[in-house]
């Protein structure tokens, strides 16, 4: 019996995503200082937070070094080799972030060497036929920005806009797709409501203020990017969750921020990882982080985003899977539902798997493994996992075989 083939639209972008702090190594920012102060504390929290099977499978969670990003994957120096692998694996695009603290380590002081570094990154991508999707804020900020109150400072949107102008002016003509903010709601919630990210505040009013300032930061950046390059495309990466039978959560988490900026976006980036259902669905497979795997949720989220009448790129989708036992099926199952949404006139134009490489998973450290490519953090050796070759076949054929 012949297999059914699901073709994706011509020109569909197939790629992977990373962020600067998670892969580059050597960053000095608010987060790098915070992780050093909290590493020992996280080892103690691990025993309370994670389940027994996770503790047994990943004993490194009890080592302070797990929580300090350090050299990470050293992508800062090895980016050309990593892009060679991406090209070899059939990718057509790559999403990465520019580290604000490298460009503006002190307020108003611009590091031209770092601008040149990112210029070389973009050139290396172009030479390999990889379309860059560039994020400008992926959770990390310079220390000076943090000392001024971070996203609670009324001037914060203007500080960010100044950085955006500097980057855009210096990299003019090299970037077609800009992502101003990555998961603004999630980061603001963790930083100012739940207190799990720096600066560890727990205040609903501070959370709402940060969200409003992030929305304003995007609006200013959107206008600046288009003043500098009229033809560029500008959007955000929004972490939407499928909420079944929880409409208030769906509105507040998925739609409220997008509604604020709906006039200032050329596309929507969707980061999809998880769902929440009431009553809770039983016996679903889980990732190493114990996140339930529910591929159909991405279909529902995409159908909901259709109302904004904007092109959509799936800017992140992946799972922690150190043994690579579920990643291939996870990817195929999500792509099946993405394809179904496309057939029902949802304008999805690209898919970026999270992630190209194993990387530093923020407050969880190094033990969760999200990469299509395994990284030995001691030797920095890269080894493509079996799922990387399956994804490569999909990328090259622009099709999914069931």
Question: Where are the language model's segments positioned?
Answer:
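Non-catalytic scaffold segments within catalytic domains of secreted glycoside hydrolases
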Residues: 1-83, 87-92, 97, 101-402
């Amino acid at each position: 019996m012949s297999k059914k083939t699901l073709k994706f639209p011509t020109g569909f972008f197939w790629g992977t995503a990373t962020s600067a702090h998670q892969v580059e190594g050597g960053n000095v920012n608010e987060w790098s200082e915070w992780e050093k102060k909290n590493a020992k504390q996280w080892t103690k929290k691990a025993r309370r937070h994670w389940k027994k099977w996770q503790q047994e499978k990943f004993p490194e969670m009890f080592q302070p070094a797990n929580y300090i990003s350090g050299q990470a994957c050293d992508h800062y120096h090895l980016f050309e080799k990593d892009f060679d692998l991406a090209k070899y694996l059939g990718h057509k695009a790559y999403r990465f972030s520019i580290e604000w603290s490298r460009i503006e380590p002190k307020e108003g002081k611009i590091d031209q060497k770092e601008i040149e570094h990112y210029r070389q990154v973009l050139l290396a991508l172009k030479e390999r036929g990889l379309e860059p999707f560039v994020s400008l804020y992926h959770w990390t900020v310079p220390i000076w920005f943090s000392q001024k109150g971070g996203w609670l400072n009324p001037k914060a949107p203007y500080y960010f806009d100044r950085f955006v102008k500097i980057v855009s002016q210096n990299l003019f003509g090299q970037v077609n797709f800009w992502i101003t903010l990555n998961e603004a709601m999630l980061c603001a919630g963790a930083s100012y409501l739940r207190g799990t990210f720096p600066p560890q505040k727990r205040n609903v009013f501070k959370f709402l203020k940060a969200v409003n300032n992030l929305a304003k930061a995007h609006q200013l950046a959107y206008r600046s990017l288009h003043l500098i390059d009229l033809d560029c495309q500008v959007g955000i990466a929004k972490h939407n969750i499928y909420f079944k039978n929880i409409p208030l959560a769906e509105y507040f988490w998925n739609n409220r921020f997008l509604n604020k900026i709906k006039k200032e976006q050329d596309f929507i980036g969707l980061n999809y990882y998880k769902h929440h259902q009431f009553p809770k669905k039983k016996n679903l497979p889980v990732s190493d982080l114990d996140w339930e795997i529910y591929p159909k949720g991405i279909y529902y989220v995409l159908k909901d985003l259709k109302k904004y009448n904007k092109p959509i790129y799936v800017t992140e989708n992946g799972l922690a899977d150190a043994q690579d036992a579920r990643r291939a099926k996870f990817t195929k199952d999500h792509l099946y539902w993405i394809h179904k949404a496309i057939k029902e006139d949802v304008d999805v134009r690209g898919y970026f798997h999270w992630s190209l490489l194993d990387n530093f998973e923020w407050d969880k450290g190094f033990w969760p493994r999200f990469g299509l490519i395994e990284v030995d953090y001691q030797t920095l050796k890269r080894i493509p996992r079996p799922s990387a070759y399956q994804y490569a076949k999909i990328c090259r054929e622009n099709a999914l075989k069931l």
